[in-house]
Amino acid sequence: MALDTPLSRAPAIAPEPKGILDPATGLPIGATDPTFLSINDELADRGFLLTTADDLITWARTGSLMWMTFGLACCAVEMMQMSMPRYDAERFGFAPRASPRQSDVMIVAGTLTNKMAPALRKVYDQMPEPRYVISMGSCANGGGYYHYSYSVVRGCDRVVPVDIYVPGCPPSAEALLYGVLLLQKKIRRTGTIER
């Protein structure tokens, strides 16, 4: 005879993910983005788009960001979880690459020590322009728990320029995915072609 406990009656599958929502509006990320709203209006009005080369390149770059991991500690586990099927970062055009020469984005996840700082800079310098950095977790953002240690760099922004900071110890995969979407929004806002 089986025991009838709340745990034995619970479904054996994970609940449905709720999606990525903007905490300020409660709407999905990108629902109020002026770029997408203007594209929808123009397509509905004429049936085709007129655009500049800069806008086309910026649009293509935001939809095909290749990221490289620089996992130094426990935050790297959440970073790996973001690329797994439950969150599926590739549906946002954010795919992993193993080489810095093929990457647009570096995710620094974990405690950066003084000995590892030159390696971080060397890998960053090998990335092609334009390149972006996401600092993930309290340790990468400012030293975290080890802030006062003699061997820890108090934030990876002292070694490489950081575009997006994702707070938490460790931040969840949803938080990192939200940071990726914010990076895409930043790229759309600033453009990629230098004049």
UniProtKB/Swiss-Prot annotation:
Its EC number is 7.1.1.-. GO terms for molecular function: 4 iron, 4 sulfur cluster binding; iron ion binding; NADH dehydrogenase (ubiquinone) activity; NADH:ubiquinone reductase (non-electrogenic) activity; quinone binding. InterPro entries: NADH_UbQ_OxRdtase-like_20kDa, NADH_UQ_OxRdtase_20Kd_su. NDH-1 shuttles electrons from NADH, via FMN and iron-sulfur (Fe-S) centers, to quinones in the respiratory chain. The immediate electron acceptor for the enzyme in this species is believed to be ubiquinone. Couples the redox reaction to proton translocation (for every two electrons transferred, four hydrogen ions are translocated across the cytoplasmic membrane), and thus conserves the redox energy in a proton gradient. PROSITE patterns: COMPLEX1_20K (PS01150). The keyword Magnesium does not apply. One of its GO terms (cellular component) is plasma membrane. It is an enzyme of class 7 (translocase). NDH-1 is composed of 14 different subunits. Subunits NuoB, C, D, E, F, and G constitute the peripheral sector of the complex. It is a peripheral membrane protein. It catalyses: a quinone + NADH + 5 H(+)(in) = a quinol + NAD(+) + 4 H(+)(out). Binds 1 [4Fe-4S] cluster. It is found in: Cell inner membrane. GO terms for biological process: aerobic respiration; electron transport coupled proton transport. Belongs to the complex I 20 kDa subunit family. It holds the Pfam family Oxidored_q6. Its cofactor is [4Fe-4S] cluster. Keywords: 4Fe-4S, Cell inner membrane, Cell membrane, Iron, Iron-sulfur, Membrane, Metal-binding, NAD, Quinone, Translocase, Transport, Ubiquinone. The keyword Oxidoreductase does not apply. [4Fe-4S] cluster binds at C74, C75, C139, C169. This is NADH-quinone oxidoreductase subunit B.
